[in-house]
Amino acid sequence: MEVRIINLEKKLINLKNIKKILSDKELLKFCRENEKFLNSYVRAKEFEEDFKDFSLNLYNSIIKYPNILDEIDKVVSNIVINKKEIGDKLLFLSELSNYNKNLDIIMFYGGFNDGICTYGDNIYYAMEWFINPDNINMKNDEIIYRYLKQYSINPEDIIYNTVIHEFVHICSCEIEDKSNPIWHLIEEGRAVYITNQLDKRDDLGLLMSENDLKWCKENEKYLFNEMFNVISENDENKYFDFISPRRNICGVSRTGYFMGYKLIETYMKTIDKLSQKEKIKKLLCTNETEVYFKTLRNMCL
């Protein structure tokens, strides 16, 4: 397995050209003509409105923060990624899951649309998430302000952590039954759990603030009772409140990632005789939900 790190900003396009574009139609045309830069969204061409929304995010963020491109350039210039270190961890996971494709980690600019995401067999990383928000005069009451303050302190650690997390999504078995939102809790939970086993840079691999994580630990029983009700009622909309970065559960965000981790951790204790490697392999090959629903129910008793 080969891991490549590609910087689209520096190698493929001068983003400042976007400033010259005035109309939505022209902007859409520009993005389509530069599909190498927008490779992560090539599939979205089939869905013009989605592609247009992404294009507008690019444009609007540049208008709102005029010096953002210069700040991104500084961030990219200062980041040093140890490709061997991260490649070794991804190779370990690929061998356990029998995943034999090469992986591109592509750095791009998403206009605060997506932070890090997977499309096909690649991982796409939006580098604007590592800007110090004070450097672009972002107001501290904006939702993403606190994330940027946290992520800009040590971008390399965040990249290592989240690339492992996203690769787990790529190389693991797809859960077959998606009729209930517990499938998503399992997917995020195993990604967080495996990341925590392989990389100890972040507490539990959750990328949560200290205060939010402290609150989750203190209110774990309440959270799981609420989650159990959501799962039992198959309330997908309410479930995604737990995943949201917008502080939807008692003023705390990303609670679902904490709960997914705890769900997987609790289940792992029932197979404690297995080695760490065997546990990770079992998680990567999980494609059913029933055993985790039983675990969730027992956590609420």
Go through the PLM ranges and name each one.
Residues 114, 212-219, 285-288:
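Amphipathic alpha-helical surface "interface" segments used
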Residues 101-108, 205-208, 275-282:
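Surface-exposed patches in mature extracellular/periplasmic domains of secreted proteins
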Residues 1-120:
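A metal-dependent hydrolase signature that marks the N-terminal structural subdomain at the beginning
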Residues 1-30, 181-222, 299:
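Post-HExxH zinc-binding segment in Zn-dependent metallohydrolases
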Residues 70-77, 151, 244-248:
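Short coil/turn segments at secondary-structure junctions
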Residues 224-301:
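Pan-zinc metallopeptidase signature
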Residues 153-163, 212-235:
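An acidic intrinsically disordered interaction segment
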Residues 76-200:
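Acidic/His-rich structured neighborhood in mature extracellular/periplasmic domains
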